[in-house]
Amino acid sequence: MTLPPPIASTAANTILEKLSFCKSLNHIKQLHAHILRTVINHKLNSFLFNLSVSSSSINLSYALNVFSSIPSPPESIVFNPFLRDLSRSSEPRATILFYQRIRHVGGRLDQFSFLPILKAVSKVSALFEGMELHGVAFKIATLCDPFVETGFMDMYASCGRINYARNVFDEMSHRDVVTWNTMIERYCRFGLVDEAFKLFEEMKDSNVMPDEMILCNIVSACGRTGNMRYNRAIYEFLIENDVRMDTHLLTALVTMYAGAGCMDMAREFFRKMSVRNLFVSTAMVSGYSKCGRLDDAQVIFDQTEKKDLVCWTTMISAYVESDYPQEALRVFEEMCCSGIKPDVVSMFSVISACANLGILDKAKWVHSCIHVNGLESELSINNALINMYAKCGGLDATRDVFEKMPRRNVVSWSSMINALSMHGEASDALSLFARMKQENVEPNEVTFVGVLYGCSHSGLVEEGKKIFASMTDEYNITPKLEHYGCMVDLFGRANLLREALEVIESMPVASNVVIWGSLMSACRIHGELELGKFAAKRILELEPDHDGALVLMSNIYAREQRWEDVRNIRRVMEEKNVFKEKGLSRIDQNGKSHEFLIGDKRHKQSNEIYAKLDEVVSKLKLAGYVPDCGSVLVDVEEEEKKDLVLWHSEKLALCFGLMNEEKEEEKDSCGVIRIVKNLRVCEDCHLFFKLVSKVYEREIIVRDRTRFHCYKNGLCSCRDYW
């Protein structure tokens, strides 16, 4: 660095010349000392002013100290540069202190002084100082300056006083497009979209043409509300005024319409984009998926180059939310192959997909991906793994995850309790509940749902009653519908149907379809047809098109051989376009998933499957099996009913599993056949599976709509209570 020439002369022009050479704080200090020693008093202020201005770009703090040492009131032309520099610094409070120093020594502000001070006030939300400054501006009549007025408007909004900002806006004599945009943008930032849109309408009525920035702000705000009236109005304005749309505006428009589900309009603006960024492509994928148009979402996704983690996660989540877990896992595999590393959010979606699929081998693979990517220490991920393994039938793996967790919260304990309950391990669930309390973890509402669920599915009536009472007595937790539902289910499964009805009638809140449905199902199982009809009628009052209630009524009439009533209900269902959900069963074989419907003959091995079914039925009949046709709701011959029962989807899946095990001599690592069904297992299939587990010496695990059934040696983990 070249040092400035030594200071030898006291001439004014020489000192000023030296100022221009100063490049470091050390040089400034040398010159400062020289000025104090040599400059006479009446010229000192001028030299100090110049020194402070020159040094502000080198060391703002030192420059401020020099400025503060000036005894005479400075002129605004001198201190305004200070205000500008201070307002751009990382310490906006210094600007406010400097302003107060100016006021203290009698300095006069001009219109250029206010903006940097207002900027600093806005940064720290110093409302009191801002209001004081507003009074000063009013006194010196600078409020007529539109830049100053806009600055005060922005300051009040930044301090959370949006109404004060609007008052300033309303009192302005002249409003340009910047002023309108500032007020609209502030309304949008506060989430006051209605006010922002009204102001947008006022702006148009005032013949001020909004620019792209205003349109971006209003479009983005309207997109967050999903208000279709606003969306249509914006579209009409753009078309009527032939507005030129840049990339930012088109991005906002696509995002708005995609978020509102108006995919045709979103696609119109999407096609106008010459350059499509990743953000807008992801918005289109998300919009299509929310509308159920997964094929369109996949097309946009496939066309998107250089996809980031957010884009991949959006596509995975789309398939998960639309109940296509296999497709979600396929996309995840593609993401991993492309080199994108998953995060917690993406893994949540993948874990959810795997849980829905119910395939244990897939669950283990997902767990290995979590380990490889260093996410195993995440508490939320471990909690999700507990749920995933539980739904995939891997109770031992569930326990292993829980016990190895470095830390647990109430969600961890509740998830593990629910997993045990789901698998019929009520005693273990109760033991874990006791251990949870011993470790001083306060149970919450979800915990009690899991414990009561376990009591219900294992017939532990007295334990369930005590736990339900403890919610209010010990933990001051008000029972909700879910807890009352568990109690209704508890009494219903134990054939205490009147007690179940009393729970419903004594509830402090109105019962819903789920609770009446629980009673209705219990009545069907225990043959209480009159009470079952009563429950079904309550359901139909709440939900006239409820398929379960209509099917139950049809079932009851079928058992009573009231075929005309059965036909009447079927006619009502057809008129209302109500259909019983079809049973679907899934089994995984050698990494590939196979699905079956009732009487399904689409599978390429159908002939072999039905031949295997005939063989199995013949063997089971020797063990005493007689098909239970009570679940067949049609007036047909008994032999035809038997065929309908034997062709249930889970039986076809089981025969496929048995057949391929024997053919390939390949079994699950534990010799287990695993099946997932979307509906409740019927009584006949339940007996069928128990007998197969004994005759063929196989362990079979079935996940139905409500729980797991582990069939082994002719017994089921549900103890025939499901």
Swiss-Prot record:
The UniProt record lists the keyword Repeat: yes
PPR repeat intervals: 75-109, 110-140, 145-175, 176-210, 211-245, 246-276, 277-307, 308-342, 343-377, 378-408, 409-443, 444-479, 480-514
Region (Type DYW motif): 622-722
Type E(+) motif: annotated segments: 591-621
Molecular-function GO terms, alphabetical: RNA binding; zinc ion binding
Biological process according to GO: RNA modification
One Pfam family hit: PPR_2
Signal peptide stretch: none
UniProt entry keywords in alphabetical sequence: Repeat
Region (Type E motif): 515-590
InterPro entries: DYW_dom, E_motif, Pentatricopeptide_rpt, PPR_At4g14850-like_plant, TPR-like_helical_dom_sf
NCBIfam families: PPR (TIGR00756)
Protein family per UniProt: Belongs to the PPR family. PCMP-H subfamily.
This protein's name: Pentatricopeptide repeat-containing protein At4g14820
Lineage: Eukaryota, Viridiplantae, Streptophyta, Embryophyta, Tracheophyta
